[in-house]
Amino acid sequence: AMRMFRAKFRASVAALIFNEQGQVLLFKHTYRKFEWGIPAGGLEYGEQPDKAILREFFEETGMQIEIERLLLAESSKEDRNISIVYLCRIVSGSFQESNEISEMKYFDVNDLPRMLFAEKDLIRWAADNL
């Protein structure tokens, strides 16, 4: 029988979006020490991860994206986080800043701004494996 485990996990979803030149799309966050980062967010209770990333991206930019495929799903013991990363593409809309996101920009994978190491690693891993 399956044992229920009560450990609380947080789940986060992220979108990796590359343009024709192989540059990666980053958001400039208004509330972070490292301002630049990949588009990401949390799940609402009972929400499916694929719906969550579409909702988050739309809420933060006013733009519609679609999922091309799941790139990664992994859990981390350290911070009890389950990360689900999708390869996505922009379908429609034009960028409107929100209170969380002030700017959106494509960067060369080898010339990324100051950002979290884990996100840099993820971007480089994805770029090498696409």
Language model segments and positions:
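Acidic, metal-coordinating catalytic segment for phosphate/diphosphate chemistry
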Residues: 1-14
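Residue-level preference for beta-strand/loop junctions
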Residues: 9, 34, 80-82
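A structural signal for short, well-ordered beta-strand segments
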Residues: 13-15, 70, 86-88
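Conserved Nudix-box catalytic region and its N-terminal flanking loop in Nudix hydrolases
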Residues: 19-59
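Nudix hydrolase/Nudix homology domain
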Residues: 34-36, 99-130
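A short coil-to-beta-strand element that immediately follows conserved catalytic motifs
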Residues: 63-72
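Active-site-adjacent beta-strand/loop module that shapes the phosphate/pyrophosphate-binding cleft
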Residues: 74-95, 105, 126-130
